[in-house]
Amino acid sequence: MSKEYSTISKIYGPLMIVEGVKGVAYGEVVEIETESGEKRKGQVLDARENLAIVQVFEGTRDLDVKTTSVRFTGETLKVPVSMDMLGRIFNGIGKPIDGGPEIIPEDRRDVHGAPLNPVARAYPRDFIQTGISAIDGMNTLVRGQKLPIFSGSGLPHNQLAAQIARQAKVLGEEESFAVVFAAMGITYEEANFFKKSFEETGAIERAVLFLNLADDPAIERIITPRMALTVAEYLAFDYDMQVLVILTDMTNYCEALREISAAREEVPGRRGYPGYMYTDLATIYERAGRIRGKKGSITQMPILTMPDDDITHPIPDLTGYITEGQIVLSRELHRKGIYPPIDVLPSLSRLMKDGIGKGRTREDHPQLAQQLYAAYAEGRSLRDLVAVVGEEALSETDKKYLEFADRFEREFVAQGYYEDRSIEETLDLGWELLSILPESELKRVKKEMIMKYHPKYRKRSS
């Protein structure tokens, strides 16, 4: 049952305080009406005796405490969902912005999702091919995983996100794959880039886009990822689709969280962020996964820009605790002109072992990835040594490692923006690069794998 009040006592930032209320609950949806008849939406952030704190999604600009009325609807925030959302673009709170008609909903779902019994979760398995060698070969994405991308200001994470959204597929199940893309706090230029990228390549047909712009109220950023995940859950668990959710930029989301926390005059935690930020991020990241008895899955790739490239900053730090690895973009590789500038050494996919190997990618994949990692690490270490003693002091084997490291970056990590490599191409390229090294140095690969996949022996057998 809805209740209407005109007893607003204070408006500050994105918040308003309504006094003299009764029976108001946390999370309840609020409809706000101005003197001119304009309507806005909000949500109850805090409900105390005779008082409610409301966050206004469209912002509090031009609202007057004397002439504004507030109606408490008695419902939680719900998003209308339908299969017709595929191929559509929405703003941060779910309104169409692509010129198309309003969505006729098949259902309305709570944006906070349904609680998922941990026992009902199925373990993430099955390889997702992104077409990017540094991810597929070295830090494999697995269906049901949450694997963030740690980037920095000015690095090409937007291009990487668009490329993954365009190319990602579960092998053998392309027809049931969908992408839900949510952008928070992006500029008009970035929004146009994403629209153009999805529309020109045809990827929009299997995608749902939510775009929250930088000049939209910060409070919208709190809702946008939850809207996206609610749609993803609907596609995955009602229609058995394999859904990849890309969230960018989670740093903007956390800044909005800090802004609202400051407006509520809460005691700040590390660097001014609220003490509950870990819990809040978990309510987003933990909505990835698979459910026993359901064919569909939700895989998450949140993207965040690390302030000052600091991986110990609270946002990447807390994200790392919740998620299952990280893909780290390197400013040094970016300066070398390498795209995508993925640094495979600090990058990690904790579930990689469960999504690769015989029957999933190829039998040599686990050993090949370990050998490539070890050889590249050795080559990087020798670069530092060369800076001190010079290349003349190195052995012939050491020089081979240096050559390997250079070619690994130029040929394996680097690839074109429209280059979509299959997993076979990625693994074969890895073996081609390992052929630079003496066979005696391939200590992490079994002899039978060398005999079967090493270019020297494959050429003989063919």
UniProtKB/Swiss-Prot annotation:
The keyword Cytoplasm does not apply. Has multiple subunits with at least A(3), B(3), C, D, E, F, H, I and proteolipid K(x). The gene is atpB. Belongs to the ATPase alpha/beta chains family. GO terms for molecular function: ATP binding; proton-transporting ATP synthase activity, rotational mechanism. NCBIfam families: ATP_syn_B_arch (TIGR01041), PRK04196.1 (NF003235). It is a peripheral membrane protein. This is A-type ATP synthase subunit B. Component of the A-type ATP synthase that produces ATP from ADP in the presence of a proton gradient across the membrane. The B chain is a regulatory subunit. Keywords: ATP synthesis, Cell membrane, Hydrogen ion transport, Ion transport, Membrane, Transport. GO terms for biological process: proton motive force-driven plasma membrane ATP synthesis. GO terms for cellular component: plasma membrane; proton-transporting two-sector ATPase complex, catalytic domain. It comes from the Archaea. The keyword Transport applies. The lineage of its organism: Archaea, Methanobacteriati, Methanobacteriota, Thermococci, Thermococcales. Pfam families: ATP-synt_ab, ATP-synt_ab_N, ATP-synt_VA_C. It is found in: Cell membrane. InterPro entries: ATP-synt_VA_C, ATPase_a/bsu_AS, ATPase_A1-cplx_bsu, ATPase_F1/V1/A1_a/bsu_N, ATPase_F1/V1/A1_a/bsu_nucl-bd, P-loop_NTPase, V-ATPase_su_B/beta. It comes from Pyrococcus abyssi (strain GE5 / Orsay).
